[in-house]
Amino acid sequence: MIKKFFITGTDTNVGKTIVSSILLKKATMSGYQTAGYKPVSSGGQKKSSGFFNQDAILLKKSSSIILSDREVNPIAFFENAPPHILSKFQKRSIKKEELSLGLSNITKKSNWILVEGAGGWYTPLSCKDTFSSWVKQEKLTVIIIIAIKLGCINHAILTEKAIISDQIKCGGWIANNIFPKDKYNMHYIQTLLNYIKSPFLGVVPYFKNKNRINFKKIKIKLPK
């Protein structure tokens, strides 16, 4: 059975990609053929073949199957701004059919796929469509990444309610410590446990060096 998940966050810069890389590694260790997919990205670095997004690079490295840059990230904008705005200015439309085609191609190679969105749940793809409408169309199970910081509780509750109201399955949430641990972190998480009804998959600790992560020591559960 092929498992397909969509990673969303309570905001931008909540650590979606780092958590995605951990989940991909965990799934690989569980015997799955894993693939990370970043259908739309903004903010890139120049390469000989053009430019590529850093998040997509990490997803590619964390996947167990071999994927090309284009397979991982078919739509990439160089500037760091909302994709639908860049799409308008650069006259490069973002079509849901293109996102679906990329996902379909990866599905032929992998049985555990993690799709990383951009920003939060209702990030626009165009003036008419949001990422959430595409997720619903593809029947993807959603995982919420919550950065533990001031304001995260309200954002997390709103995000889960929005997903449920869209009649989409929420497979769980992960608390991500993006700042060095302080005395209130566990109180944030305990409050979230009281309010968020979706399965709690675990806590990702703060990493001083994100290039030296011991994946085996991170105790998060894979979504079902």
Swiss-Prot record:
One GO MF term: magnesium ion binding
CC annotations in GO: cytosol
Major subcellular location class: cytoplasm
Record keyword Magnesium present: yes
Pathway: Cofactor biosynthesis; biotin biosynthesis; biotin from 7,8-diaminononanoate: step 1/2
GO biological process per UniProt: biotin biosynthetic process
Family of this protein: Belongs to the dethiobiotin synthetase family.
Record function comment: Catalyzes a mechanistically unusual reaction, the ATP-dependent insertion of CO2 between the N7 and N8 nitrogen atoms of 7,8-diaminopelargonic acid (DAPA, also called 7,8-diammoniononanoate) to form a ureido ring.
PANTHER family assigned: DETHIOBIOTIN SYNTHETASE
Protein name: ATP-dependent dethiobiotin synthetase BioD
